[in-house]
Amino acid sequence: MSVFLLVHGAFRGGWAWQRVRPHLVAAGYDVHAPSLLGAGERSSYAGQVRGLDSWVDDLAALVLAEDLRDVVLVGHSQGGLVTTALAARLPERLRCVVHLDAAVPRPGERGIDLLGAPAVDPARDLVVPPRPLVAGDDLDERTAAWMNARLCGTPVAPSLDPVPAVPAEVPQVFAFCAGTPEGYPSRVTRDRRAAAGESDVLLECGHDAPMTAPDLVAALLLAAARSPHDIHQTFTPISG
């Protein structure tokens, strides 16, 4: 049976999946939702993050140590940088990659380039502080407050490294959130793919879907685990 490896986005930790995880476990799946180095309960180690490989090495070690196979690898938001690079590292271990409102640069592009390449790169040791979330749309005040208490800074170094291509043999599912604002890296990814005529899934929810729409996210992930090539039999595709 497949196993899920869930990778959170910027400023968050493994806790970001806690509302999705029970649905996957109830369906009989093993689920791993680690906090990246320097995030969540590991935020005090942010200074050890030297680049994208710091995160990829960390997750690859988990996959190999636990001998995970047939992995449904899920990256949300900035987590898309990590899952894309991990897929290039360990394609033989994967069932598929699910890009959930994820920042996915073109091969060889950097995460920071999705924001428009800066004239001068920020210092690699910079840790960007989080901005408090504001309730609105599908993010209620209680959830926003709970998340704000757990947000942490995000090392910028991984966003300064080029991201490799996902090998062609690894199936990919792209799902975007309708409520994601213009300018978000994941929105840039969505708009690029739409302009190229790609057929992706659009979820009617905000960017923090794992917290605000866990039932919907779980349904997407379970459908991907069953048959990533047939995702559009369950979720209506959108295209440019």
Description of each model-found segment:
Residues 88-94, 98-130, 183-192, 235:
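Flexible "cap/lid" loop of the alpha/beta hydrolase fold
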Residues 166-172, 196-198:
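Short, proline-enriched alpha-helix->beta-strand connector loops that line the catalytic pocket
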Residues 2-43:
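Conserved HGGG/HGGXW glycine-rich cap/lid loop of the alpha/beta-hydrolase fold
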Residues 74-79, 83:
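Gly/Ala-rich beta-loop-alpha elbow adjacent to hydrolase catalytic centers
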Residues 148-166:
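Active-site nucleophile elbow and catalytic-triad environment of alpha/beta-hydrolase enzymes
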